[in-house]
């Protein structure tokens, strides 16, 4: 047992069984589904594009369940990596690992179980999909440690959150075409942009604690940088249409998504914590709008 676990042990021992289950639920962010939705939409974009419509139902189930499992596992390993930092950050000081309600060892077991269940589901698909899941595990497990070494953890998050895209094409088509990699690139740009909103919420705390983020890197040019990222995302999504020939419905979806992004800049233009967090949450609707465009175009 680590020194941290010993120090936090009394907080964990005083909990009833329902309370402990509630702490585990918070640990996997079951009470905050936004992260799963931000991971789900690009995965569904890929499934619908790869299948040219509704994908096989079992494949759809595996990827939908896998989104929740891997996102939950990612949250657990993130909190484990930040268990020394989170007690000193306003937004994260009440997390189960930060308060000691869940020990570091327990968190690692939760991570392992979630990843094993996710891998068991992937194992029912073809071998290319199984092989692609291996770098997916590495991306999910290593992301939390990037903020100590680079100002670009948001880019890495986009790589991790979007890895379901090449896996989806592999599962449906047996290969990953250029279209799949274009969609993956668009997702990296999107995730970097929306997670910068999130990083702006914590910017003052991160500077004080020595953590790194794109919000710190961009500084006073943060809104300009995000505008460029979103513009590049839409440019790459336009290239997706050149490959897939999706038509008017897809462009209507992109148009709605662009209006939603413009609204984010309006509400967060003064960079306050609350509006920046709302702008981050608002990206759920951006992902949904793009998905609806793809789904209608594929009918």
From Swiss-Prot:
Keyword rRNA-binding listed: no
Recorded topology in the membrane: Multi-pass membrane protein
PROSITE patterns named among the record's database cross-references: UBIA (PS00943)
GO terms under biological process: ubiquinone biosynthetic process
Subcellular location: Cell inner membrane
Any Pfam family hit: UbiA
Enzyme Commission (EC) number: 2.5.1.39
Catalysed reactions listed for this entry: all-trans-octaprenyl diphosphate + 4-hydroxybenzoate = 4-hydroxy-3-(all-trans-octaprenyl)benzoate + diphosphate
GO cellular component: plasma membrane
TM region(s), chain numbering: 34-54, 57-77, 108-128, 163-183, 221-241, 245-265, 277-297
Cofactor: Mg(2+)
The protein's annotated pathway: Cofactor biosynthesis; ubiquinone biosynthesis
Function: Catalyzes the prenylation of para-hydroxybenzoate (PHB) with an all-trans polyprenyl group. Mediates the second step in the final reaction sequence of ubiquinone-8 (UQ-8) biosynthesis, which is the condensation of the polyisoprenoid side chain with PHB, generating the first membrane-bound Q intermediate 3-octaprenyl-4-hydroxybenzoate.
Family per similarity comment: Belongs to the UbiA prenyltransferase family.
Protein name (record): 4-hydroxybenzoate octaprenyltransferase
Species of provenance: Xanthomonas oryzae pv. oryzae (strain KACC10331 / KXO85)
Taxonomic lineage from the root: Bacteria, Pseudomonadati, Pseudomonadota, Gammaproteobacteria, Lysobacterales
């Amino acid at each position: 047992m680590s020194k941290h676990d010993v120090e936090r042990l009394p907080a964990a021992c005083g909990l009833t069984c329902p309370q402990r289950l509630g702490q585990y639920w918070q640990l996997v962010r079951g009470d905050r589904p936004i992260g799963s939705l931000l991971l789900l939409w690009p995965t569904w974009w890929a499934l619908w594009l790869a299948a040219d419509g509704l994908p096989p139902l079992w494949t759809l189930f595996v990827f939908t369940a896998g989104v929740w499992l891997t996102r939950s596992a990612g949250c657990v390993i993130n909190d484990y990596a930040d268990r020394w930092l989170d007690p000193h950050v306003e937004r994260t000081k009440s997390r189960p690992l930060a308060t000691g309600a869940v020990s570091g060892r327990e968190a690692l077991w939760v991570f392992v179980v979630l990843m094993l269940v996710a891998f068991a589901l992937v194992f029912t698909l073809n071998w290319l999909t199984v092989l692609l899941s291996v770098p997916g595990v590495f991306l999910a497990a290593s992301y939390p440690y990037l903020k100590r070494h680079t100002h670009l953890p948001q880019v890495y998050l986009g790589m991790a959150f979007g890895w379901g895209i090449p896996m989806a094409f592999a599962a449906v088509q047996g290969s990953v075409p250029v279209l799949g990699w274009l969609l993956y690139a668009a997702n990296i740009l999107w995730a970097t942009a929306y997670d910068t909103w999130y990083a702006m919420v914590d910017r003052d705390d991160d500077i004080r604690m020595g953590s790194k983020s794109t919000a710190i890197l961009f500084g006073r040019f943060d809104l300009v940088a995000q505008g460029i990222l979103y513009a590049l995302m839409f440019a790459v999504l336009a290239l997706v249409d050149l490959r897939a020939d999706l038509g008017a419905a897809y462009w209507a979806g992109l148009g709605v998504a662009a209006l939603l992004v413009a609204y984010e800049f309006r509400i967060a233009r003064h960079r306050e914590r609350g509006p920046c967090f709302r702008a981050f949450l608002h990206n759920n609707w951006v992902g949904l709008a793009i998905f609806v465009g793809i789904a209608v175009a594929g009918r």
